[in-house]
């Protein structure tokens, strides 16, 4: 089941959870989607600013597998 997260802080807290497995980053022309897979839900954050997306990618937890699509 998918769920959408609207705040960057909430997304980072979700990515730091113990059951978070991986993050997939999907880029299109004007939007970047970060998808974190947890045990029950797939959480999605939509970012419209490329600079914020790059900062967010650097601040992801180091133990998480990150995949650019």
Curated annotation (Swiss-Prot):
Task: Answer yes or no on keyword DNA-binding.
Answer: no
Q: Which family does it belong to?
A: Belongs to the eukaryotic ribosomal protein eL38 family.
Q: Which InterPro entries match?
A: Ribosomal_eL38, Ribosomal_eL38_sf
Q: Name one GO molecular function term.
A: structural constituent of ribosome
Which organism encodes this protein?
Arabidopsis thaliana (Mouse-ear cress)
**Keywords (A to Z) from UniProt:** Ribonucleoprotein, Ribosomal protein
Q: Which gene encodes it?
A: RPL38A
The source's superkingdom equals Eukaryota
Give the GO biological process terms.
Answer: translation
Quote the cellular component terms of the Gene Ontology held in the record. cytosol; cytosolic large ribosomal subunit; cytosolic ribosome
The name on file for this protein is Large ribosomal subunit protein eL38z/eL38y
